[in-house]
From Swiss-Prot:
The gene is Tesmin. This is Tesmin. The keyword Transcription does not apply. It is found in: Cytoplasm; Nucleus. Belongs to the lin-54 family. The modification Phosphoserine is found at residues 34, 67. May have a role in spermatogenesis. SMART domains: CXC. It comes from Rattus norvegicus. The keyword Cytoplasm applies. InterPro entries: CRC, Lin-54_fam, Tesmin/TSO1-like_CXC. PANTHER family: TESMIN (PTHR12446:SF22), TESMIN/TSO1-RELATED (PTHR12446).
């Protein structure tokens, strides 16, 4: 009797469940309730076959307030710093194409004479970039998009989804002028490959210029101004790369007329052996200029190389022409020249260039570079006095073609043999002439005239001796 009465009465739990899950309540709008298949036993708990506990998926989103319909504008206050997030898709849809063909300039692949197959796993680093012209930004991008795409630049090697999904994830609609590309850099740092993922799968080549320490000595490219690179557009990773050599004899496409890349390790040029004996900087005893060793980090190796060179030859860094004081023995070549046909009267003869005569240690043939040689006397004296346009057909003065006295240059002082002894003798003559005028009690003007006449006589005597030593006559 009591059990029947208690079973007919509704408890607080039943009233709460009817209030929440009733057909007239809004919370049950998105729930798919299924009726019970049969009467449950008294000892078993009733099971609610709804969207939370059932195996079937709900037909509509559970939280409509956080899932607006497509096309509806979402308030900025709701999203905050996340303007847009990519939709989650299964990895089965991301199917990369079977292969890409990459055209590489023949200058970038020395030794490659035909198509070669390079798998992606063979040390290739893929960097997603998008090349735009300088001064233009990414179309349709915003500061929030740029901040969202910034972390992508730190990825050096990653896996990409399909091109359609990557375009949606980038948040930047593609325009017809954009040229998204993937730059593949080998681990050795030797080449970079450029892949264009246009609609027609057209492949384009790209000129690359290595960066050296001294950019002024490197020939500049004839291409237009460099272009800026923006990271953001993700492209599918090809399974294999077919390296096809392309002869660089045609015009490059307008989309890739540039060679600017993101800042990274510079492409090092060919190594230069700077501690060898045939290095000009090392032979002259100076540090290398515009070389890879232009610093003090290799000082220990440089000191060892210098010591080894000096052990073999103590005079290795000494000049070929010895140094002497004024009035000492004449200079001579330490090894001697080895001229064959010039007669030692050309500038490439080291003895003639140093204005010294050949000695017994020279191995020259038909030498004319000696003291009493008339050709040497004429060549040593006349080039300092000749005008640059006297002989149009010859760049040097030949003794057979020379005729007449040389003309003095207008912008150059004449060479003279005036020494300190000549100056002292001239001053002594002038003082003697002044004392003589003072003893005779001449007027000041007459005394000045006598001193000037004595100076003219001394000067004419000096010039007479100078011309006589050169074989010239004064009319």
């Amino acid at each position: 009797m009591e059990d029947a009465l208690l079973g007919a009465m509704t408890g607080p739990e039943d009233e709460l469940g009817a209030e929440l899950f009733g057909s007239e309540r809004a919370f049950a709008d998105g729930l798919a309730l299924s009726p019970a298949g049969g009467a449950a036993d008294r000892d078993e708990l009733p099971v609610l076959a709804d969207a939370y506990l059932g195996a079937t998926e709900p037909g509509e989103p559970l939280l409509r307030a956080l899932s607006p319909p497509p096309g509806a504008e979402v308030p900025a206050a709701l999203l905050g710093d996340f303007p847009g997030l990519p939709e989650l898709r299964s990895s089965d849809d991301a199917a990369p194409p079977p292969a890409y063909s990459v055209h590489v300039l023949s200058s970038l692949l020395p030794g490659a004479r035909g198509p070669a197959l390079l798998p992606l796993s063979a040390g290739v680093r893929v960097i997603p970039v998008e090349i735009k012209e300088a001064g233009g930004g990414v179309p349709g991008s915003s500061p929030e998009d740029a901040a969202f795409q910034a972390p992508l630049a730190q990825e050096s090697c990653c896996k990409f989804s399909s091109s359609q999904e990557a375009e949606e994830a980038s948040g930047c609609p593609r325009k017809k002028d954009s040229s998204p590309m993937v730059i593949c850099q080998l681990k050795g740092g030797a080449q970079m490959l450029c892949i264009d993922n246009c609609g027609a799968r057209e492949l384009k080549a790209l000129h690359l210029l290595p960066q050296y320490d001294d950019q002024s000595s490197f020939p500049q490219s004839e291409l237009p101004k460099p272009m800026t690179t923006l990271v953001g557009r993700l492209l599918p990773v090809p399974a294999k790369l077919n390296l096809i050599t392309q002869v660089d004899n045609g015009a490059l496409p307008s989309a890739v007329n540039g060679a600017a890349f993101p800042s990274g390790p510079a492409l090092q040029g060919p190594p230069k052996i700077a501690l060898a004996g045939y290095c000009d900087c090392f032979s002259s005893g100076d540090f290398c200029n515009s070389c890879s060793c232009n610093n003090l980090r290799h000082e220990l190796e440089r000191f060892k190389a210098i010591k080894a060179c000096l052990d073999r030859n103590p005079e290795a860094f000494q000049p070929k022409m010895g140094k002497g004081r004024l009035g000492a023995a004449k200079l001579r070549h330490s090894k001697g020249c080895n001229c064959k046909r010039s007669g030692c009267l050309k500038n490439y003869c080291e003895c003639y260039e140093a204005k010294i005569t050949c000695s017994s240690i020279c191995k020259c043939i038909a030498c004319k570079n000696y003291e009493e040689s008339p050709e040497r006397k004429m060549l040593m004296s006349t080039p300092h006095y000749m005008e640059p346009g006297d002989f149009e057909s010859s760049h040097h003065l030949s003794p057979a073609k020379f005729s007449g006295p040389p003309r003095l240059r207008k912008n150059r002082q004449a060479f003279s043999c005036i020494s300190w002894e000549v100056v002292e003798a001239t001053c002594a003559c002038l003082l003697a002439q002044g004392e003589e005028a003072e003893q005779e009690r001449c007027s000041p003007s007459l005394a000045e005239q006598m001193v000037l006449e004595e100076f003219g006589r001394c000067l004419s005597q000096i010039l007479h001796i100078e011309f006589k030593s050169k074989g010239l006559k004064i009319e």
